[in-house]
Amino acid sequence: MFKLSRFIIPMILLPVLIVTTQEDPTLMVAPRVDNFAFIENQLLSSSRYTQVDEQNESVLNRFEEDFNLQYTNEQLDLLGYELMLENNQLNLYFEKDSFSLILEDKTTGYMLSSRPEFQGYSETREDNTANRNLMNSGLWIESIRTNNISSSAIKVESLYTIADASYQTNGSQDLANIDWTKPYLLETNSYQRNRVQVTTSNVNASSFTTTINVTNYGFEFDINIILQSNGFSVQFDPTTVQETNDQYRLLGLQFFPYFGSAREDVYPGYVVIPDGVGALVRTNQRFDKTYQSDYFGSDLGYLRTSIADLSLPIYGMIHQVDRIGFYHEIVEGAEHATLLANFWGRNTRYHRITNRYNVRRIFRNIINRAGDGQDVLPEEMVMQPYEGTYQLLKNDQASYVGIAQSYQANLEARQSIRSLEPTQTPMQVAMIIHEQEPTFFGTSRLTMTSMDDVQTIRDRLMEDGIEEQVLVLKGWSDDGLAYRQPYYFNLPDRQGLIDVMEDVNADGQHVYLEQDYLVSSELSSRVQFNRDVARNYSKLKMSYRLNRLDNQPINEYYLYPSIAEQKLANDLDAIQDLGATGFAFPSLGNTLYSYYDDDRFNRTETLNTVTSMAASLSANAMQRPSAYMFPHLNHYLDMPITNSQLDLFTDLVPLVPYVLKGYIPTFTPYLNFNALGKERLLQMIDFAVNPSYLLTEKPSSELRYTYSNKYFTTAYEDFQDDIRDVYAYIASALDHILGAKVLNRSIIQTGVSRVEYDNGVTLYINYRSTPVTVDEITISALDYEVVL
């Protein structure tokens, strides 16, 4: 083992806070109060960081000895399970009446069940029959009566609920004589087959089809189950749905809502949610919380909003870290799916996570200018097929890193991700060129950075050793910057811009023009309100008031996707003539909505349009793009540094960066506005995210009367030394892992992480204010070490 010496980084560079100081770095982290160590430990133990995995032997032994599900063949027969599919690794058992499934790993005998197992361990009746019928069935159907359409009238029922099943016992166990089958045995003939029937067909070596006939409501549809090498998939095609009773309409389906659920605090693992950069909910504590969010953001076509940002169509449940778990991926149809999670509390003894596939959604039909109306349903269902896969994770793959690796491998197998990492640590250099400032009559152009200034700043950065620059020009048009996109190609200094493009291309670097064709505002001269602004499902214009802190509210517009596509097509020749790498899109990669345009169009139509737009360009940079844009992505901008910070989250983890590591370069939000100082830089190294700055030649005070006044510190002269020092500090770590993939990340002790890469490099990051020695490596306070 060779410990890399970072001798090129003098100690005086360690205080790389945005507020420059030349004090000794140890003074910056020294305790200022008597209980500083306690305060620091509380901070490092919070959900802003990743925590140490469960290591208590008694907890691990209890899980291994008492909660290791392994039914015998006789017990499976008694419960009605049939071995439907098998391969060299797995057995898949299926019980059709309840639509329940058990996946068995042949090597270990460990079973993952679609039912919440170990019911009744409190030795009392834990749930009433209605709740048990929901829990013990693997298919939930959401429906509504057509004469009573409202959110409160939605019915969520399982097959057992519809069949009015009842049980032989109340489900309580005698811990001295446990019978795992006891909570699930039905009373003879209690399942009403005249209300619902499930049949299987097309059974072969790797798949079978189930047909669900809900005679009570006049629903009939097919679901396919396919065994894969390391898991199984569920396929649902809405074209198979028949609705023969006009009194009822199908809204959505939940497949295996309790698959892999964890009881109370006995499972020493966690739930993985792709919220923001990544979040964990550890299953060793009670939360009494629920979580619900649409994938790929809110659908404003339904006036639905969500705080969460789910850019990846995946989730996971780890029963025991580095031993066993699973993860779920929506391969097709994620734009119509909602992530649902319930955690142990007053209403449930289980942690569970699942998806709901929405084939219809209620919306408000507005009938007058006052906004009066009624709730209605679309007559047509979403016709986008759904496919979700469940993949078993074992040994060192059973972790959030293993989930990132598995999902990355799936993306690579489908050619949905490309290997584009450079050979030197890149830095995004965004520059504000022009903005509009108010005058007595209208506005006038304010030039913050001329083309000559752009060249000068680039050259100085290269002299400071920053040779791999990703240049993003903001406000490059005469239109200005904030809220004025999509810009016209009116170029105040066309030749100067061409010269910049030629120099950047000659250096083998990238230059993007920031442009937004999907989201605009009342300030854009290129948008006509009546023609271009989309209508939502309620036929209202998608114009929303943005209240700003400076009391200058703006009406933000969402355009028809077809209009956005047409405007991009009109600009293709212009951007190619300039020689730009492509466009940098703020919203194209993260905004999907349903809309009305003489007919109602759902998110699939929008998704197809925006991906077609991205495919028309040879290269794209995007801010916080969702997974559907990864095949067309060259640079990921504005990587979130946190999640939505809900109080049920226990850990912050780099799920999204690790999915992209080794393939797509990712960049942090602008470090000009870094309020976390050294901690933020260490997190960038820990998460493998590259630096980013927003710069101007003129002082940012020039922007004070413009809509860009939120950029309160941008002058290159103010940041020149910080940029040089911060880049050198970060690149001294990231240079060694370019093109490498993450093998493992572990928290050795609170505030100290170790990240191992497939090229043999290991990074140690110490978030503590005191030196730490681990693996015979001493890491200075608030610092890192690289081991080759």
Features from the language model and the residues they span:
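Structural alpha-beta junctions
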Residues: 231-233, 260-264, 465-466, 506-509, ...
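Glycine-rich, histidine-containing beta strand-loop boundary motifs that form or position
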Residues: 89, 96, 237-238, 257, ...
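Carbohydrate-recognition beta-sandwich/jelly-roll modules
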Residues: 83-450, 455-468
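Aromatic-lined carbohydrate-binding/catalytic grooves of carbohydrate-active enzymes
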Residues: 421-502, 509-566
